[in-house]
UniProtKB/Swiss-Prot annotation:
GO biological process, one term: cytoplasmic translation
Record flagged with keyword Ribosomal protein: yes
Protein's UniProt keywords contain Transcription regulation: no
Protein name per the record: Large ribosomal subunit protein uL10
One Pfam family from the record: Ribosomal_L10
Protein's job: Forms part of the ribosomal stalk, playing a central role in the interaction of the ribosome with GTP-bound translation factors.
Natural source organism: Methanococcus maripaludis (strain C5 / ATCC BAA-1333)
Protein family membership: Belongs to the universal ribosomal protein uL10 family.
Cellular component annotations (GO), alphabetically ordered: cytosolic large ribosomal subunit
Transmembrane segments: none
Length: 335
């Protein structure tokens, strides 16, 4: 807390501001420091309107925010919270929310918007001007375009660019003249928004690199892990609620295959065993000479008679298909 002896040396508004910041810091379980240094006023207002219902954003002086964080850490006996000040940067602000850090990062990232590049700024990428009409009438702007290296000319009463031209490459400094031209052409190569400096949750501070994940890649890894775990459970015969049906089906199919191969007759395998024996009989008969066959066998061989239709294998096939579909069905429950 602010020492009472020194209160007369501190402006009252600063004391009030620190107290307000402390109240905000204690109000939510998720506290984030964000960088808003390069965000123009118009874009900032748009962002605030987008996130208003999900979080509280408060701007203040870094010195006051630092003091508020340190005092809250001391009052709550939470030294880890005090480490949040290490992530503070010029132009920082505080966000208080109940949104988990990953969702918070995604929400802030999606709230970013394109903006013109300022003179003196470093180009974030190659900035290319496409060939075509600018829609502007002949005038001083033609000279401005040529001054920044654009092949401009009058075409059908309008100023046009004759060919695609890269006016500045990634990493190069954008001149003030080029900044004016790009703005006039409506080109916004910069993405502005609130950048995460650090997010505190339950004793852990996450940085932007921790929170920035490829969702498709992450989901793919989860799906792969699920499928591997499913197959391990089935093959190692470790029943779970997700795999017990497949394990039983596999055991049934394996037992049935053994029964058929060993000619062990049961009510489930009799048809398959007889069908197999019949097929083997026809195959052997086909290798024998005509003198060794009766007329019935000769007729069956010449007509290509098939073994009796067996219903069980069809059922088995369906079961196998069901087994193959089981992992993806389980994934459907996850996502």
């Amino acid at each position: 807390m602010i020492d009472a002896k020194s209160e007369h040396k501190i402006a009252p508004w600063k004391i009030e501001e620190v107290n307000a910041l402390k109240e905000l810091l204690k109000s939510s379980s998720i506290i984030a420091l964000i960088d808003m240094m390069e965000v123009p006023a118009v874009q900032l207002q748009e962002i605030r309107d987008k996130i208003r219902d999900q979080m509280t954003l408060k701007m203040s002086r870094n010195t006051l925010m630092k003091r508020a964080i340190e005092e809250v850490a001391e009052e709550t006996g939470n030294p880890e919270f005090a480490k949040l000040v290490d992530y503070m940067d010029k132009g920082a602000a505080i966000i208080a929310t109940e949104m988990n850090p990953f969702k918070l990062y995604k929400t802030l990232d999606e709230s970013k918007s394109p903006a013109p590049v300022k003179g003196g700024a470093v180009a974030p990428c190659d900035i290319e001007i496409k060939a075509g009409s600018t829609g502007m009438p002949p005038g001083p702007f033609l000279s401005e375009l040529k001054a920044v290296g654009l092949p401009a000319a009058i075409d059908k009463g309008k100023i046009g660019i004759k060919e695609d031209t890269v006016v500045v490459k990634e990493g190069e400094v954008v001149s003030q003249k080029l900044s004016v031209v790009l703005s006039a052409l409506g080109i916004k190569p910069v993405t502005v928004g609130l950048n995460v400096l650090g997010v505190y949750e339950d004793g852990i501070i996450y940085t932007e690199s921790d929170l920035k994940i490829d969702e498709e890649e992450f989901i793919g890894k989860i799906q792969k892990a699920y499928t591997s775990a499913f197959n391990l459970s089935v093959n190692a015969v470790i029943p779970t609620s997700a795999t017990v049906e497949t394990i039983v089906q596999k055991a049934f199919n394996d037992a049935k295959a053994v029964s058929v191969e060993s000619a062990f007759v049961t009510d489930k395998t009799a048809d398959a065993i007889l069908g197999k024996a019949y097929a083997q009989m026809i195959a052997v008969a086909g290798l024998a000479g005509d003198d060794a066959l009766d007329e019935d066998l000769k007729g069956k061989i010449s007509s290509g008679a098939a073994a009796p239709v067996e219903e069980a294998p069809v059922e088995e096939q369906k079961e196998e298909k069901k087994e193959e579909a089981a992992p993806s069905a389980g994934l459907g429950m996850l996502f």
